[in-house]
Design a protein with these regions (language model features):
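Residues in the recognition helix of alpha-helical DNA-binding motifs
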Residues: 21, 25, 50
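Short, solvent-exposed coil/turn segments
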Residues: 1, 26, 35-37
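Polyanion-binding surface elements
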Residues: 1-19
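Short helix-start
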Residues: 5-10, 32-55
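Hydrophobic alpha-helix position signal
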Residues: 12, 25-26
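The DNA-contacting recognition helix of HTH DNA-binding domains
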Residues: 19-20, 44
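Glycine-centered, phosphate/nucleic-acid-interacting loop/turn motifs that mediate DNA/RNA or nucleotide
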Residues: 29
């Protein structure tokens, strides 16, 4: 099954951090993302990967 692609605001809500923090993670390539029509989307399974590395 394909991972759900989340906009930065939804990824931030699920991580419990500000949207700017998710955008910073994308910019610094500290979280996996996919570009769709020029907009970065975070796969929902990348949130768990990030949580595992951040702890």
């Amino acid at each position: 099954m394909a991972a759900e692609l989340l906009r930065a605001s939804e990824a931030a809500r699920r991580l419990g951090v500000p949207t700017k923090e998710v955008l910073r993670l994308v910019r610094d390539r500290r979280i996996r993302y996919v570009m769709v029509n020029g907009i970065a989307h975070v796969p929902d399974d990348a949130l768990e990967e990030y949580r595992a590395r951040a702890s």
